[in-house]
Amino acid sequence: MLLSGCKRKVADDAVFANDSVTNCAKPAQKEFKMYTMSPMAALMEQMYAENNQLKKRIIAGESVGDFPKHIVAIHSAVMTDETDNDAFFKEQAAKFIKAQELIYADAANAKTHFNNAVSSCITCHEGKCEGPIPRIKKLYIK
């Protein structure tokens, strides 16, 4: 008699009662936890996408449109780590909003103001969370 399972052949009259390969036992699995973005992370993703579109409009010489007022939520959005919401962050957030407002208030110099806004993002991320910096740098208009 020949038994097979789990791609392993078992000889006649063999006893492998505790052999996990023969029994096809699966190791205990850790519970999978789905990552959910904090409201701040979601806002930053939204701002990145919007600024990427804004970059394209500036390069094409199109209208920049109106200042997206939801950006001011950067002051109140819940962060992944609330200890990051300190004086440095608040100062950098204010600089970012000012740079963003200038893009729309002075469209003739939109490229300069846009690049200043990108620089303000990088300055903040250098002090808080460096991970997104390479991605943010791609926003610069050359």
Walk through the language-model features, giving the residues of each.
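Sequence contexts marking disulfide-bonded cysteines in secreted/extracellular proteins
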Residues: K7, N23-A25, I122-H125
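Extracytoplasmic c-type cytochrome modules immediately beyond a signal peptide or single-pass transmembrane anchor
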Residues: V10-A117, I133-K142
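The canonical Cys-X-X-Cys-His
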Residues: A117-C129
